[in-house]
Each structure stands twice: as structure tokens, then as C-alpha cells.
Amino acid sequence: MKKRKVLIPLMALSTILVSSTGNLEVIQAEVKQENRLLNESESSSQGLLGYYFSDLNFQAPMVVTSSTTGDLSIPSSELENIPSENQYFQSAIWSGFIKVKKSDEYTFATSADNHVTMWVDDQEVINKASNSNKIRLEKGRLYQIKIQYQRENPTEKGLDFKLYWTDSQNKKEVISSDNLQLPELKQKSSNSRKKRSTSAGPTVPDRDNDGIPDSLEVEGYTVDVKNKRTFLSPWISNIHEKKGLTKYKSSPEKWSTASDPYSDFEKVTGRIDKNVSPEARHPLVAAYPIVHVDMENIILSKNEDQSTQNTDSQTRTISKNTSTSRTHTSEVHGNAEVHASFFDIGGSVSAGFSNSNSSTVAIDHSLSLAGERTWAETMGLNTADTARLNANIRYVNTGTAPIYNVLPTTSLVLGKNQTLATIKAKENQLSQILAPNNYYPSKNLAPIALNAQDDFSSTPITMNYNQFLELEKTKQLRLDTDQVYGNIATYNFENGRVRVDTGSNWSEVLPQIQETTARIIFNGKDLNLVERRIAAVNPSDPLETTKPDMTLKEALKIAFGFNEPNGNLQYQGKDITEFDFNFDQQTSQNIKNQLAELNATNIYTVLDKIKLNAKMNILIRDKRFHYDRNNIAVGADESVVKEAHREVINSSTEGLLLNIDKDIRKILSGYIVEIEDTEGLKEVINDRYDMLNISSLRQDGKTFIDFKKYNDKLPLYISNPNYKVNVYAVTKENTIINPSENGDTSTNGIKKILIFSKKGYEIG
């Protein structure tokens, strides 16, 4: 009897998996890569942070910038982003820390003492017209300094201002960069240097202490670079739009508007871990890791005592390639799923979105070296035996922030909920850094072998006989991430480098991000599902209402790169109307209410008015494709598949060379080739559904359908030039076959799409 094979569409959910490898070369190579990534995250921490105001009372900030030395001047040539009338600075505040190379008494002075008050810690050292006071500074200590400048009705644009000091040897000089350090802008709950900060005199209106004045966070600001200095200034649309600068708004009461570990100021000025993705440098896009695993291969063997294992049994293994897709399940947690018409406005409703991070891995369905025998027959597995599982995997981070010292806990699940093993990663399975869009181990290195439940490989991952048979039948495993431990790297203001905080844990931060953001999942690029979280208002939480309103249109632009050429919202040339929207029930009710208030009948026309709220769940998918319950593309409309195959570069009796869109390639299981005679009788060349994979991708990106691959390695033989050669494409949604009891495995029952049909004399 022929072995029954079932072609399963690739289905996968996001997860993370543990590593266990003794490959020292792999470890050493990864450590070098990790150290390089971490060391790249540097910027200067030297100097003072300055705020320049157009009014006398520190209420109208025009520029926020840092100066590396005691030369705190801003020439008018660097103020082109500010309206001319606001370039006359009447007040300024500088803050930071000062340190000395030798203990001594110092006297401070400026180029405008008559307009200056200055403190070192709590001691006043300059008070406008009065004489400066000496202060003793000790080597090795950091002293907080604050300078206030006020000058009514200045006559020149910009500001010419220098800070000097004089030691006991009466040597006066502009304070150098080695002696100045930027302030540490911690959240107000911090109990570090904030305790000994001076409260003398007016302060910058900055309630959340993120470094951005409150008025700018509310009204809008932008960041530009002039002569190697970052300038944060109020948003002026008629100036900044022409330069292509980005307008930011953020909460004046949240140090991090998106609730991630990076302040709004750190994000927009670049004082941040350089491994954070570009889109998450926006204060309203959350920076956080999403860690999955890609399983590349699975090896199954009989679980035997090594001391009694004979030579023959050592070769009785099953090795299969696997594939993993990252998915988000739309479901109600009662095994039911609802997809209802959303009032014909361009959306649909799912009963719920799964929040679990898991991955379903599809095992290759092609013929094994053992021929037609079952897996159990190949391995000599009997009902009383158990089988060992060895998986080859890689970690991958599809989020927007790096995670350090990664230690996950993962369950391997068969079927719906048969847990084969739950494995907690140990220190020797740790990945030092997993940056966004990076793999561990990297693709040029061997994958990790996962084959044991403990540190000493004494407890293998096993399956009983019935579980083994189920795995062969379904050819699927699910990997659930129960939890993941990993550290955060933050900017160190003392040395300008990123430092991994070993006391931090992403698992403590992620719940706060999830509670205060809207989640959007989008599959626009290569049909890969990408999740992003955007800061959004929670009307029932007073603090969260201080965030700027966020529209669905703006969220798509800042998180996914949508743009508006000719006023139409597009993604990589595709109009927004080519995508559909899917909401969970709570989100759909919110959207429905907003549409009613707007008197709108089509969501696409009011995307700039639909406001996001925290905890919304929105899935946006390419309309051309069909999806399974995990939102993986498994098919497409027939017209779409045909259109994708219309560009045949050349054809012959050896095969077809085509130029096929990579999105279409992802949904194809393969092709069926047949010869049709003049009376309409058809003979399938590859008439087994495990022989559909007769195509290959060439280095130039073109697809070749090889007629010889399952035709005894010979070109097609066409006895009559008027006979037709028909080629059909088969999508993944049409390859779940239930063979008949007599073992029939023909392709007769497969739904197929005709993509090529020519007579023999036409193909040469």
C-alpha cells in the first residue's frame, strides 16, 4: 500500500525557543557580532544642555541644543529654522555636570556676567553684577551646574555666550569638553542625582523631565542638525515642511509617551540604543522586541539506550526540512471564529485577537530517502517505543528594539494542547543580543540544536508511539513561548555609551506598552505580518489622555511608511483601498461609533479622522490574497494567480522560465503539468501530489518550471505537434488532500489554475 501523504499549508505563530549548542566557533562568532552591535551605540555625552527662549521669563522656548564646551553661543546662521522675529534670545538656561582634573578653588565667569546667575550644586557662584564667589571642587566628583541668562531687548540675533573658569593659579580659560557632562534626564521617580539637584531660580517648564519643554510637546516640535549639533525647535509648518523635517508631538506628562524604556527626548535626538528601529525613534511608536523562532530542520530517531544501540539502528532516523511563518491568530477563545460584514465600509470583525506568541512549524511533505515506508517503519518504531526529537532553530527579532541576555521558556506542543516538553533556557543557551531583524545564530552560521530538556542532555525530548504517528499525519508542531527574560540597554549620560542594565527585564516593560498603545498588524511587505504599537489615548486614564490624539492614517504613516503622493494614501505604490481592515469586537464597536459621528459610510475616506485608543487591535491585509485562521496567505483569486504568471520569458520541452511576483510564490505549493491530445484527453506528467514542487528559483530571481524533474529527468515527449501542454498552478489552500482508502494519491482532486497552455509546435 502506498504511503499516504498530506500536504499541509505553512501555518505559524510567533515564538521564541531555547538554544543548546556545543559549537564553540558559533558562540565566539556571535559574541563578536554582539559586541560590535553594542559598541556602535555611542554618542557624545560631553557638554551642557541649553534652552534658548524668545521671552524674558523662560516661557517661549525656541531652541534646545547641547554645546560640548563652555562656548554656549548660537550664531544667527544656525537659526534658519526659526522665524526672524524669534531669533532674539532674551533668556536661556543651561544645565549639566562639571568635573575637575585636580582639586582646587575655582572662580567662574561668563561673557555676560551682568545678565547671569549660576549655581554649582546649591552654591551660587555668579549673581549678575555682584562679584563671583570661589568654590572648592574635588577631583573625581561630579557637580551639578545651572546657568540662567536674562537680557531684555537684545539687539542681535542669536547669542554670543561663553563660560570660563579660573583656578588658584589665575589661569582663565573656556571650560573644555573634558570637564562638562550633559544632564541625566531621568524619570521623576528616579532617586539618583535628582536628590542633589539645585532648585534655585526658574526652571525649564518640563513636567515629565524628558528634556522637551511642555509647550513644545503639546504644540509640536522638530529636530534638525546644524554644524554637527542637534537643534530641537518649535514646529513651523511653512519652514519645516519645505525641508522635509518631521513634526513630533508627545505627552508633556509622560517621560516616554509610548511607555517604552526610552524617553521622548532620547528618541528624537538619537541618544538611544542605535539598534532601535528607525520607526521606533518616533516618540509615538513603541520600541520593544518581538522574538520568534525559525525551525529549519527536525530530526527524529528511536529513543534507545546508547550502551545497547547497535550499528544498524544508529542510521534509522528521519530528517525533514521545516518552515515557519510568523502569524497572528484571529479567534474567539472558545474554538469559534467570527468574520462578519462590517457594514460594507471596507472592514470585517473577528471575535477576538490572540495575544499569545506561538509558532506553528510545517514539516516538509516531500518523499524521504526511505521511499514509501512510514516513519515508524523507517525507524523500526513499535507501539512500546518512544522517539527522540531534535530541532534545528534560530531566534529572530521582528520587533523594534533589541533584547539582551535572552532567556526564554518554551513549550513544544503537538496537536491542540499535547505538551511534549516545557524548556527553560539556561545560561549556556543565552543570546547576548538579538537586534531587530536579526537572527541568532546569524544565517551564515549553523543553527542551534534543541534536543534536551535539561542542562546536561540527560533528558531528551521524546514522544510516545501515538504522538509520533500524529506528528507524521499532521506534519505540524506548535511552539508556545510561556515567558521570555531579557535585559534592556539604555543611554549612559556619563560616557555617551549604551549600557546593558542587568537589573532590567523586558517582561516588566511589555505589559505597560500593551496597556497604553494600539496594536496594528500589517502584511504589506512580502506578505510578512509585522506588528507595531502606537501610543494612543485611553479616555478612562487621566495620565493617558495627556497624549496627542493619533489618527489611523497618521499611525500608518509613522509606523509602516505609508505616504501620500498626489494626496492618496499608499504603501509602496499600492493604494490603501487595496487593503482590508479587520478588527476585534471592542475595536469594531469603537470604529462603528466614530463612523456614525462622522456620518461616514466608507472607512477609507475618513482615515484621517478615525482616532486610535489604547488596546485597539487592527489587522490590515492585502485584499488580493486568501488567508487561513492564522492570517497566513495561502491562496489568491484566480485572476491574481493568472496575472502573476503571464510573463513567460521562454518555453521549451524542458520547461518554462517565468518572472513571478515573490508574493505569489509564497502562496504556491507547486505546479501540475499535463499533455492534452486533439480529442481533449489529458495525461498528467506529475500525477502525484507529492510531486508538485517542480519549480525552482534562479539566482536572478526568475522561476523555472522544470518539466524533467518528475518525468524520468527527460524533456516532454510530444508525439503530435498539435497536442497541448497545459501547466497549472496550485496554491497552498488547495493542497489539503484526504487520500481514498485504496491509497489513491493522484492529483485529480486538487483545485488547480491554468496558467499556461500552448500546442507543441508553439513551445519548440
Curated annotation (Swiss-Prot):
PA14 domain location: 43-179
Keyword annotations from UniProtKB, A to Z: Calcium, Cleavage on pair of basic residues, Host cell membrane, Host endosome, Host membrane, Membrane, Metal-binding, Plasmid, Secreted, Signal, Toxin, Transmembrane, Transmembrane beta strand, Virulence
Residues covered by region (Alpha-clamp): 231-239
Outcome following mutation: residue 541 to A: Loss of heptamerization capability
Effect of residue 229 to S: Abolished interaction with LF
Result of altering residue 231 to S: Does not affect significantly interaction with LF, while it impairs tranlocation of LF
Claim: Secreted is one of the keywords in the record: yes
Region feature Domain 2, membrane insertion and heptamerization, mapped onto this chain: 288-516
Family classification: Belongs to the bacterial binary toxin family.
The protein's name: Protective antigen
Gene: pagA
